Structure formats: structure tokens, C-alpha cells
Amino acid sequence: MKWYVLQVMTGSERDVCTALRRKGVKARAPDQRMEIRRRGQWQTEDRLLLPGYVFVGAEYTAALFHVVSPVPGVIRWLGLEHGEPQALDTREALRWRLDSDETLEPSRVLFHADGTWHVLDGPLAAFAGCPVRMERRQRRAYVTAELGGVARRVRFGVIPV
């Protein structure tokens, strides 16, 4: 089975996944757990890892295209070249944790006094070679990663250790 990426209308990712599952297509919109500060208190919330994108796991055929494309909210297949979208390779699929339906926990990050940091565990560890901007105060990490052949900025939650 290969994984493909759909661009969908932002806010309709879960609805698109539900509609695709009803049609027998394996679909995922990965969630992550993040800590958000509101009114002076840290609260835990589940947020989409990639707003505006849904991953579809299947072997690509013309029939699959005609099942998926008319679903309300689907805009286009990413990487559609020469009539067939580009599939994610196995390494990339594992990086986005498409093998499990679990919500991703925040990555644990060790911050040093000299301003450097080291990722101990969590989903951020899979993006070791990508450019990362760390915001310790907001407990966020922004990673520039490639998705469907285009560089995208992805936000991850972190827990300072």
C-alpha cells in the first residue's frame, strides 16, 4: 500500500476522512497533542498536524481517483504529474507516523544554558535533518519539511525538560 496526499479545504479534514472511510478508502489526518497557554494556564489540546492535508493509503487506480475526487472538501491530489499522483516513500510515511491512528504526543526537548537544544524523543526526532526553529516560551517547534515535493512549515508541540 502506498500513501498519497490530498489537499483539502482547511477545517474539513476530519469530514473528508470520515467520507473516505465510508467509501472504503483508508484516510488519515494526523493529530498532535499540544500545550497552549490561555488566561495564564497551560491547557492540553489536540490539533491537526497538517491543516489542509489528508493522507490516503491505497494503490492508485483511475477508480480510486473517481471515488476520492468528488468528496466534498477535496481540492486536489498533491504531486499529480502525468495523470498519476506521486506516492510518499516508506521513509516519509513513517516520518509522518501514518502507520498508527494515535494522537502524537509532544516531543521532549532538552534545552541547554548556551541556547542549544537536543530532541530526546517524540515525532520531532524523525525530522533531524530538516531546518528547525524552536520557540521555548511558546513550547513550539517549526520544521520545514517536504510534502508532495513542496517545502511546508509544520508546527510541533514540545515539552521542555
What are these regions (language model features)?
Residues 1-118, 133-138, 142-161:
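Acidic-enriched and Gly/Ser
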Residues 113, 123-125:
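Short glycine/proline-centered loop/turn elements that form peptide/ligand docking sites
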Residues 125-134:
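Short beta-strand-centered aromatic/proline hotspots
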